[in-house]
Amino acid sequence: MRKRILVSACAALAVFAAHMPTALAAATDQLQSFVTGVKSAKGEFTQRQVKGQGDSLKVTGTSSGSFVFSRPGKFTWRYAKPYEQLLQADGQTLYIYDKDLNQVTERKLDGALGSSPAAILFGSNDLEKNFTVKNGPTRDGVEWLELTPKSKDTQFERIGIGFKGGNLEAMELRDAFGNTTLLTFSAMQKNPQLPANAFRFTVPKGADVMKQ
C-alpha cells in the first residue's frame, strides 16, 4: 500500500513548477516564488494514513524518511521508518527497492507517473493536461491548492498542495474510498549542490530485479 501511494504520490513538484498556469501563479505569490526559484531540493518527510472525517479522523499508519529531487524527473525518496524502502528515478527509469525482500522493481518513469501526485512533484508532463487546478482554503496559515485528476483511471480523486512562507509544507491525497494520506515536509534545503551521480541507481548485491 505504501509503495503504491508513493509511486502515486511522491512524484509531483517539478512538473508543477514547469507548467503551472499563469493566472493561478498570479493568485498565489508563495507558489510563484517556489515555482520559479526552486529547481532542486532535499529534506525530510512524514507520511500519515488517515481514515474518517471531521472529529472522527483516525491515524492508521505513520512512516518517515528523506527525499532529494532535481527537476525534471530525478528524485530519491527513502523510507527509514518503520521499514526501509527506496524509490529512485534517474529521469528515465523508476527503481523501487524493497530491502526486506531484497527485490528491485524497474518501471519506465513516464508510465509510472502519469496523472498521479508523483507527476506533480517530480515529473515532466503537462499539469493542465492531467489536472484541474483551483485555489483552496487557508488552514493554520497554510495556503492550499486543490488538484483534481482528469483521468478516471487513477487511485486518487483529489490532491491538495499546501504552502507557507514560500515553502512547500504538505500534500494531502484523498482516494476514491475516502482514505487520506497526508505528507508533511521539514528541514527542506532549496537548490542544494548535488553530485553528478546523485540519482544513479546501483542494484544491491544479490537482489532480484523485476521489470514492468
From Swiss-Prot:
Main location: periplasm
Protein's GO biological process: lipoprotein localization to outer membrane; lipoprotein transport
CDD domains referenced in this protein's UniProt entry, alphabetically: LolA
Entry keywords, A to Z: Chaperone, Periplasm, Protein transport, Signal, Transport
Keyword Transmembrane carried by entry: no
Function: Participates in the translocation of lipoproteins from the inner membrane to the outer membrane. Only forms a complex with a lipoprotein if the residue after the N-terminal Cys is not an aspartate (The Asp acts as a targeting signal to indicate that the lipoprotein should stay in the inner membrane).
Complexes and interactors: Monomer.
Official protein name in the record: Outer-membrane lipoprotein carrier protein
UniProt source species: Cupriavidus pinatubonensis (strain JMP 134 / LMG 1197)
Taxonomic lineage: Bacteria, Pseudomonadati, Pseudomonadota, Betaproteobacteria, Burkholderiales
